[in-house]
Regions:
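Alpha-helical transmembrane segments in inner-membrane proteins
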Residues: 1-337
Length: 337
């Protein structure tokens, strides 16, 4: 019964994923018909035309980034929730995304000031270092604080400190760079380029493959550290791999499109409820698909709701994701009475 439910959910998610991909590519300030899209993609017709440039240089990389980054952030959230054994953990709430944001902001601001440009590889490295530093601090605190509520407060305080430090660094940026930095810091898919997207896709593909190889240890760890150790899992190395993969995935997203809120918490929860299971072999691909659907839908709303004005992606993800987290927190609180 559960296998049938999972298969049906995957099929529905795959159809929604494909439909949203098609709708997002075709709609916007410049509408493109399915006929135009197919001719450009399959026959490469119309090179140099407005439709060709809009589709291949702006719309397609943006939509693909929304699909992949949404799935990536959801998987990152699932790994963090497994690590802390709490469904309210996530890269944004625990300050991991904010740490990556601070490091990237510092590198971009001072790199542009000193050298005039910053390689995307340096941006990704900075994001990973910032994410790992914040995650390490949260791990140290988690050993001393056994209340998840207090740990979340600590994570939010880390996020506030990192955001304040980023705003401080922005005061040293060139006026020409401030608008781009502000847009990036609020989360946006609008500046995605094929070159940067390819780098992120390569890193994400390796990380997701490693996640699939860790499916059995993750399943054992869900029953507790002692059970995992009894099943032959090297818990210390496994925990290091789990937090490292989660931070690297979150760093890829932050480096490319900036911090995005609530996706890493809301989507894993919705995936488990949808599939009716918490088994990692089922949840991991489900998280990726639902995360892609969620982010594509939010990006489409951000682009079209008040066109030509564009909303920050985190504004839309928070609008739809926050109620899910509130419901989750209420149910969790009710279960502990």
């Amino acid at each position: 019964m559960k296998k049938t439910r999972c298969a049906l959910c995957y099929a529905v998610l795959a159809v929604c994923f494909a439909l949203l991909l098609a709708v997002s590519v075709g709609t916007g300030s410049a509408a493109l018909s399915p006929h135009e899209i197919l001719r450009i993609l399959l026959l490469r017709e119309g090179a140099g035309t407005a439709a060709y440039n809009v589709l291949l240089k702006i719309r397609l990389p943006r939509v693909l980034a929304a699909a992949v980054m949404g799935g990536t952030l959801s998987v990152s959230g699932f790994l963090l929730q497994t690590f802390f054994r709490n469904p309210i953990a996530g890269p944004y709430v625990l300050g991991v995304s904010s740490g990556a944001k601070l490091a990237v902001g510092a590198v971009m601001i001072f790199g542009m000031k000193l050298w005039g440009c910053v390689p995307f590889g340096a941006v990704m490295t900075a994001a990973f270092v910032g994410a790992m530093l914040c995650a390490s601090f949260v791990m140290i605190v988690s050993r001393k604080i056994h209340s998840m509520a207090m740990l979340l407060v600590v994570g939010m305080m880390i996020g506030n400190v990192c955001s304040a430090a980023t705003d401080f660094f922005v005061t040293f940026a060139k006026e020409s760079d401030i608008a781009n930095l502000t847009s990036w810091s609020m989360g946006s898919f609008s500046a995605v380029s094929w070159g940067n997207l390819r780098i992120c896709l390569a890193v994400i593909a390796v990380c997701l493959l490693l996640c699939l190889l860790l499916v059995k240890p993750i399943g054992a760890y869900q029953f507790g550290e002692h059970y995992a150790a009894s099943m032959g899992v090297n818990v210390r190395r496994f925990r290091g791999a789990l937090i490292g993969l989660s931070c690297l995935l979150a760093a890829c997203v932050t480096a490319l499109v900036g911090p995005i809120s609530f996706v890493g918490i809301a989507v894993p929860y919705m995936t488990k409820k949808l599939l009716g299971t918490a088994k990692p072999m089922a949840v991991l691909p489900g998280c990726f698909l639902l995360g892609g659907v969620f982010c594509m839908a939010c990006d489409w709303i951000a682009r079209t709701a008040f066109s030509p004005t564009e909303l920050a992606i985190s504004t839309v993800t928070a609008f739809f994701g926050a109620p899910v987290v509130i419901v989750m927190a209420l149910k969790r609180g009710g279960g502990h009475r």
